[in-house]
Amino acid sequence: MLCINLWTSSKQSTTETASPTTNTTNLADSPDIYRNGEQYKPGVGTRQLKENIIYESKGYYYQTDELGRIKVAQGDLRLETGKRNNRDQLKAGYEDRLPNDHGGHLIAKIFGGSGELDNLVAMDKIVNTVKYRDVERAWENALKNGETVNVKIILDYTEANKRPTGFNVEYIIGDSKKEIYLSNGG
């Protein structure tokens, strides 16, 4: 059984450290969770996520907004090698992707995160390879030391843009709660 802790989604303006507060909302408890590829729109050519749904992919939970953009990713991390999907990594962010963007995993492949569009967004290469990666290393080290790691990533967007403007990354390692806000550059 998957136990997921959640926190409030208040954005930290320019701060990179804060303390999340407990919230009882749990995507895993939703009665309507899409699974096994049901999160994609049928017959639209290029795969796109359905709007306003909660879905499970590789043991992690996600929520989309009214435009089919990933708004929340969450779960209890585990060390497990996932698969990379170069095709989907190049598509993440669609027409709003910037030249220096990568297709960044919200839940890294070292934690068994999906390599498909259901876990990828356009992410500035410095954010992806340095800032976000530093947080992932802390999670990886905690797991290797036998600690539990629970994460919730809330994505910010402007208007109808498919490229996130930032990531509110909230996590608990053991009993320690942390929150950072990463601007998506560009």
Language-model features: locations:
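Long, low-complexity, intrinsically disordered regions
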Residues: 1-53
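Domain-level detector of nuclease and nuclease-like folds
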Residues: 46-48, 52-186
